[in-house]
Amino acid sequence: MSHEYQIPNLVLDETDKQILTILHEEGRISYTDLGKRVDLSRVAVQARINQLIEAGVIEKFTAVINPAKIGIHVSVFFNVEVEPQFLEEVALKLEEEPAVTSLYHMTGPSKLHMHGIFTNDQEMEEFLTKRLYPLRGVVSVDCQMLIKRYKSRMGMKL
């Protein structure tokens, strides 16, 4: 009989929550400045952040890039219906596509929900006709083009 060891859920205290809230808004803040805001030393803040990283609470630090500022003007949400036996295969291929920014398996008849960004309509059409439609198991594709973004948040906010 084998037992898998599971790490128990990490209990966050108020200081951890403060650190996460500040990092969510100001990911480039120094340990020293963060320590001043939460009344801890630089070393104590660094130790807590390392613990949060090791526990998987913090998955990564990243820069949020404005696509329009670098010439990417088409943002599209896709619902892709896939035959159940091909779902994993299609998902693995789509997650490798540079234009795909997020990909989720949703409830419903083998639905993949996906977001993609493209420089123009022609690039999106090429993605559809040459990359998505030919995938084995794809039954149907429904897409909606983003008109205006009101809110977009990376990660979870406490």
Curated annotation (Swiss-Prot):
<dbReference type="GO" id="GO:0043565">
    <property type="term" value="F:sequence-specific DNA binding"/>
</dbReference>
<dbReference type="InterPro" id="IPR036388">
    <property type="entry name" value="WH-like_DNA-bd_sf"/>
</dbReference>
<keyword id="KW-0805">Transcription regulation</keyword>
<keyword id="KW-0238">DNA-binding</keyword>
<protein>
    <recommendedName>
        <fullName>Uncharacterized HTH-type transcriptional regulator YwrC</fullName>
    </recommendedName>
</protein>
<dbReference type="GO" id="GO:0005829">
    <property type="term" value="C:cytosol"/>
</dbReference>
<keyword id="KW-0804">Transcription</keyword>
<dbReference type="InterPro" id="IPR019887">
    <property type="entry name" value="Tscrpt_reg_AsnC/Lrp_C"/>
</dbReference>
<dbReference type="Pfam" id="PF13412">
    <property type="entry name" value="HTH_24"/>
</dbReference>
<dbReference type="InterPro" id="IPR000485">
    <property type="entry name" value="AsnC-type_HTH_dom"/>
</dbReference>
<dbReference type="InterPro" id="IPR011991">
    <property type="entry name" value="ArsR-like_HTH"/>
</dbReference>
<dbReference type="Pfam" id="PF01037">
    <property type="entry name" value="AsnC_trans_reg"/>
</dbReference>
<feature type="DNA-binding region" description="H-T-H motif">
    <location>
        <begin position="31"/>
        <end position="50"/>
    </location>
</feature>
<dbReference type="InterPro" id="IPR019888">
    <property type="entry name" value="Tscrpt_reg_AsnC-like"/>
</dbReference>
<dbReference type="InterPro" id="IPR036390">
    <property type="entry name" value="WH_DNA-bd_sf"/>
</dbReference>
<dbReference type="InterPro" id="IPR011008">
    <property type="entry name" value="Dimeric_a/b-barrel"/>
</dbReference>
<feature type="domain" description="HTH asnC-type">
    <location>
        <begin position="12"/>
        <end position="73"/>
    </location>
</feature>
<dbReference type="GO" id="GO:0043200">
    <property type="term" value="P:response to amino acid"/>
</dbReference>
